[in-house]
From Swiss-Prot:
SUPFAM superfamilies: UDP-Glycosyltransferase/glycogen phosphorylase. Keywords: Glycosyltransferase, Transferase. The gene is ZOG1. Signal peptide: none annotated. Pfam families: UDPGT. The active site is at 26 (proton acceptor), 125 (charge relay). This is Zeatin O-glucosyltransferase. It comes from Phaseolus lunatus. It comes from the Eukaryota. May regulate active versus storage forms of cytokinins, and could have an impact on seed growth. Can also use UDP-xylose to catalyze the formation of O-xylosylzeatin but at much lower affinity.
Length: 459
């Protein structure tokens, strides 16, 4: 099944085929990248399962009419609810494994596109490399790997794989333990995908040299002569007040009435469920902090967000929402995160530190109270707090199996929102935001990096 699929004129010089990993943070980054490439007048084809194409387009607030979506059927997969006792989203693994069956339809699509264009450029998520493997067998197809993680995280991974060799005068900060970052059953899937990265023509990161310059340079050093592009940030730097169909979320009307930088936004991403007792502690801590807040409290995504029963509704302390009326909002549906972060009333973000969320917060000049849960998130938290110094720790990864008490939540919120320390973080975050925005202007380092990539694939 193909959505918005149009035939390609034979004189088309280059088309781009994007293969995202089927998790919300990955789907979203690929949609942002699609928007940037389409703006260069290059046709973009975006592939996925029927379920995940529907999910991606449903949650994306920007126009997608210029993107050619291809929604393919894959074998049925179980879609269990998230397990709050499991910090890693193991409940999503069946959907990941089902998406590996995209190889055959993607291969057929590649054959078709390669017969209609002079060059086809495949950009696949590093966790979907097996799906793109047939690109190596078609003479006018080039393959690039997109890493949906920070350069800090990935360069650290490579450095450790190489045995931590000395790299001049450069020193990594102390990394948090990898224990608990990835479930055992996911390691095999990841390892199998990484076997195919040797076939690629280069690597792409959603970052900027303004944010992670030294770590991008390390990736270039470690990459065996293959090109590395830091093409980010992918997300829009200016956000429309309404989405593409004219809707504005009610929480934005509430934000309009608040003082500048007075609201902390709390969201822990789309993949991991919190334990009931942890939710109680967060609620109590927020109430005791006396700070304005927007808290997104919804069940983590299932592998198929459209399947099965209604999502779980989390219980809050009795009378909580009545007591915090006027002080805070609890949002139980999908929230417009980028719009919230871009609003002048938002002054902080309590986050799980997924890279997509980190980048959105950094590009909007909002400091982060870190609460990592799995995967790359603990290292992203170190980047935010120790390297960029635009955040503070709420959940210490060294105490990852412990309940975060209400007093710790309260203290973290107060430190970020009402202390000199928090004000200094906000000032650093705004300076970094301004530097990023300048880098995207004509002549800026990020603008030139994108120009370099477009010229490379269009040659």
């Amino acid at each position: 099944m193909a959505l918005n699929d149009k035939s390609i004129p034979h004189e088309t010089k280059v088309v781009v085929l994007l293969i995202p990993f089927p998790a919300q943070g990955h789907l979203n980054q690929f949609l942002h990248l699609s928007r940037l490439i389409v703006a260069q007048n290059i046709p973009v084809h975006y592939v996925g399962t029927v379920t995940h194409i529907r999910q991606a387009t449903l949650r994306y607030n920007n126009p997608t009419s210029n993107i050619h979506f291809h929604a393919f059927q894959v074998p049925p997969f179980v879609s269990p609810p998230p397990n709050p006792e499991d910090d890693f989203p193991s409940h999503l693994i069946p959907s990941f494994e089902a998406s590996a069956h995209l190889r055959e339809p993607v291969g057929k699509l590649l054959q078709s596109l390669s017969s209609q264009a002079k060059r086809v450029v495949v950009i696949n998520d590093s966790l979907m490399a097996s799906v793109a493997q047939d690109a190596a067998n078609i003479s006018n197809v080039e393959n690039y790997t997109f890493h949906s993680f920070s350069a800090f995280n990935t360069s650290g991974d490579f450095w450790e794989e190489m045995g931590k060799p000395p790299v001049g005068d450069f020193h990594f900060p102390e990394f948090p333990s990898l224990e608990g970052c990835i479930a055992a059953q996911f390691k095999g899937f990841r390892t199998a995908q990484y076997e195919f990265r040797k076939f690629n023509n280069g690597d792409i990161y959603n970052t900027s040299r303004v944010i992670e310059g030294p770590y991008v340079e390390l990736l270039e050093l470690f990459n065996g002569g293959k090109k590395v592009w830091a093409l980010g940030p992918f997300n829009p730097l200016a956000v429309e007040k309404k989405d593409s169909i004219g809707f504005r979320h009610p929480c934005m009307e509430w934000l309009d009435k608040q003082e500048p930088s007075s609201v902390i936004y709390i969201s822990f991403g789309t993949t991991t469920a919190l334990r009931d007792e942890q939710i109680q502690q967060i609620a109590t801590g927020l109430e005791q902090s006396k700070q304005k807040f927007i808290w997104v409290l919804r069940e983590a995504d299932k592998g198929d967000i459209f399947a099965g029963s209604e999502a779980k509704r989390y219980e809050l302390p009795k009378g909580f929402e009545e007591r915090v009326e006027g002080m805070g909002l609890v949002v139980r549906d999908w929230a417009p995160q980028l719009e919230i972060l871009s609003h002048s009333s938002t002054g902080g973000f309590m986050s799980h530190c997924g890279w997509n969320s980190c980048l959105e917060s950094i590009t909007m000049g909002v400091p982060i109270a870190t609460w990592p849960m799995h995967s790359d998130q603990p290292r992203n938290a170190v980047l935010v707090t120790e390297v960029l110094k635009v955040g503070l720790v709420v959940k210490d990864w060294a105490q990852r199996n412990s309940l975060v008490s209400a007093s710790v939540v309260e203290n973290g919120v107060r430190r970020l929102m009402e202390t000199k320390e928090g004000d200094e973080m906000r000032q650093r975050a705004v300076r970094l935001k301004n530097a990023i925005h300048r880098s995207m202007d004509e002549g800026g380092v990020s603008h030139m990096e994108m120009g370099s990539f477009i010229a490379h694939i269009s040659k």
